[in-house]
Regions:
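Extended catalytic core of nucleotide-activated donor transferases of GT-like folds
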Residues: 10-13, 42-55, 64-114
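N-terminal subdomain of nucleotide-sugar transferases
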Residues: 1-65
Length: 114
């Protein structure tokens, strides 16, 4: 039986986010496109879990909870209410509701407070 898995993780060396965004400055990418470009860099855990889960016939999603810009981008595209005042935990809660995973795998999350 196939299932839907969501992995939520953070990357401890957050300077990689600003370096990545500097490279993407001229591109107007959607959340999915931006996430895909970031995951191509294979930084930290990357999307290794999702790639392998998909090979097994499962749906798999990745959320980098401490990548503030990416989280705000998701909120901007997916939430009708004011997203500017939401913190990452509130955005994350909305992402979980939207994805409706069967399994949530939390990995390396020192900042999460649900």
């Amino acid at each position: 039986m196939a299932y839907k898995i969501l992995r939520i993780y953070s990357i401890p060396y957050i300077h990689v986010y600003s370096n990545f965004l500097d490279e993407q400055e001229s591109k107007n990418l959607s959340y999915c496109e931006l996430q895909k470009e970031f995951l191509k860099k294979k930084i930290s855990y990357s999307d290794v879990l999702s790639r392998n889960m998909k090979k097994l016939g499962n749906q798999s999603y990745e959320i980098i909870e401490n990548f503030d810009y990416l989280q705000k981008k998701w909120a901007q595209e997916n939430m009708s209410s004011k997203f500017d005042n939401l913190n990452n935990n509130e955005i994350l809660q909305n992402q979980i509701v939207e994805i409706k995973p069967d399994i949530i795998f939390f990995q390396n999350l020192p900042t999460i407070n649900l």
